[in-house]
Amino acid sequence: MRGASRTDAGVHARDQRVAFDPTVVIPPRGWALGLARHLPEDIAVRRAAIVPAGFVPRFASVRKRYRYRITFDELRDPFLEGRTWRVPARLDAAVLATLAEEARPLVGTHDFAAFRSAADERESTTRTLFVVAPEVDPADPRSLWITVEGDAFLHNMVRILVGTLLDVARGRKPPGAAARALASRDRRDAGITAPPDGLVLDRTWLSNEGEDAWPPDLPP
């Protein structure tokens, strides 16, 4: 099996893409319904399509959207455990404004060497971010989502971006820390690595979305 993203343990995915080469011919509807009977409750096949043999979703990925949830609450909420980063502080307009201001220099094509884990040894660390946007969750005023869209990502890149933004908002890093980390390429200038719980791979765009998709009316 070949996936579109290598998500860390504890990270969630709403739109992970997986390809495999079957030994039997079954239409996409049959795969979607049949696999559902054999998967655990926290994994679901929401769409199936036919792609060429040997298709690798990771190499066909042209854009991804991640969303990270932060909940500002001194008390633990059992309904959100494992699905948010709980911060014992108050979410107000000043926090949101600081996050938005700190995120602004991250949009565009930059060298994100300071925003990757030590385990990531890829030569090229240049990536393009189209969106870095914090917004309050309309269904939960305690929480906000930070949406990050880009052409590709380094290991732990989104989690370090989020950690840096929140470090500045909480006064643990000086204003402009994200921009300085971009310029220096030094991991020490960036913030902490946010925990995996709040991160969701929300959308994956591929150069080839496949054929005969089922269900046909579900967005890819």
Question: Residue spans of the language-model regions?
Answer:
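Structured-RNA-binding interfaces characteristic of tRNA pseudouridine synthases
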Residues: 1-220
